[in-house]
Amino acid sequence: MILVLAESALELVPKEIWNHPAVLADARRRGKRPGEILLDRARHHPAMRLLADAKRRGRPDIVHQVLLAFQYSLLAKRGLGKAYIHTRDDYVIAVSPEARVPKNYNNFVALIEQLFALGKVPPKGEPLMELYRKDLATLLQELGGVWAVFHESGARKPLSQMGSELLKSVVVVGGFPHGDFQNKWVVEKAAVVYSLGEESLDAAQVICKAVTAAEVAAGLL
């Protein structure tokens, strides 16, 4: 399975709120410049009121939860899974199956901030994460141009019947907290659109279920 977490709410603090007291206080506490820290609704909520599309931004915790679920799975440990994080600003993070994401959230934030600063982590040796500019369409085309997506509008199907398909697919899941894909074509052009029910689920919940189905199909469970 190749996971693409699309339009993720992961970005550095944008310039227009660098001078907001909430941002300055957080940056000062951490010994960094405002433009070097991740935008985080839990810390920067007062400042984010000034941002466009604020409801879909500032949620690095979504990426953290998804990577914890995916990177520590049997699928990834057996080399049968690879994750890509696409951000709303068209950055892509390629995550090695060998990367063990910090379980502590603050350590994860520090790691991603280092990644934005250096382009790869660790800075020396074989990178476990790499960051580069790339839009979602280009990424999906490079991954074969065929993908499945989880979306409320999709066909409901038992997980037991999805597993073998998910195991060999590029699987797209939204990495944003509210709303729908801004790139509508992600759903419209998908080879398969899956639904896990009428109720919207957190991205990490979707990933857990999809990974489990693929692991069963691969004989890992």
From Swiss-Prot:
Site (Stabilizes Arg-59): residue numbering on this chain = 61
Enzyme class of the recorded protein, top EC level: transferase
Which residues of the sequence carry a binding annotation for S-adenosyl-L-methionine? 174, 179, 196-201
Specify the superkingdom: Archaea
Q: Where is this site: Interaction with substrate rRNA?
A: 59, 100, 103, 107
- Summary of subunit composition and partner proteins: Homodimer.
Q: What is this protein called?
A: Ribosomal RNA small subunit methyltransferase Nep1
The source organism is Pyrobaculum aerophilum (strain ATCC 51768 / DSM 7523 / JCM 9630 / CIP 104966 / NBRC 100827 / IM2)
